[in-house]
Amino acid sequence: MIVGHGIDLQEISAIEKVYQRNPRFAQKILTEQELAIFESFPYKRRLNYLAGRWSGKEAFAKAIGTGIGRLTFQDIEILNDVRGCPILTKSPFKGNSFISISHSGNYVQASVILEDKK
């Protein structure tokens, strides 16, 4: 049974402005594993990756119902499976989780569905 659904839409240029003012912003948002992947990319791909992880984590926080106030970005990790699809590899939710991240032009959108295992 679906117990939560969260959606987030983010302008990539807004993330870029924050990142340009404070490059440590990426360390606040990304886990150690995510940061290693982020650092392997060229600049433009880094921005898309960072914005995608931001949006995915915001969508997760909305789906679980707490928002990012009670969770931190470090409580949530989004990596890719062997096919390159994003998956939630770390979160406080114990059920099944499904995530989709899409980029188009200057926007990134993420959707998270949480499903109870019962």
Curated annotation (Swiss-Prot):
Its cofactor is Mg(2+). Its EC number is 2.7.8.7. GO terms for molecular function: holo-[acyl-carrier-protein] synthase activity; magnesium ion binding. It comes from the Bacteria. Keywords: Cytoplasm, Fatty acid biosynthesis, Fatty acid metabolism, Lipid biosynthesis, Lipid metabolism, Magnesium, Metal-binding, Transferase. It catalyses: apo-[ACP] + CoA = holo-[ACP] + adenosine 3',5'-bisphosphate + H(+). One of its GO terms (biological process) is fatty acid biosynthetic process. SUPFAM superfamilies: 4'-phosphopantetheinyl transferase. Mg(2+) binds at D8, E58. It is found in: Cytoplasm. It is an enzyme of class 2 (transferase). Pfam families: ACPS. GO terms for cellular component: cytoplasm. Transfers the 4'-phosphopantetheine moiety from coenzyme A to a Ser of acyl-carrier-protein. Belongs to the P-Pant transferase superfamily. AcpS family. This is Holo-[acyl-carrier-protein] synthase. It comes from Streptococcus pyogenes serotype M1. The lineage of its organism: Bacteria, Bacillati, Bacillota, Bacilli, Lactobacillales. The gene is acpS.
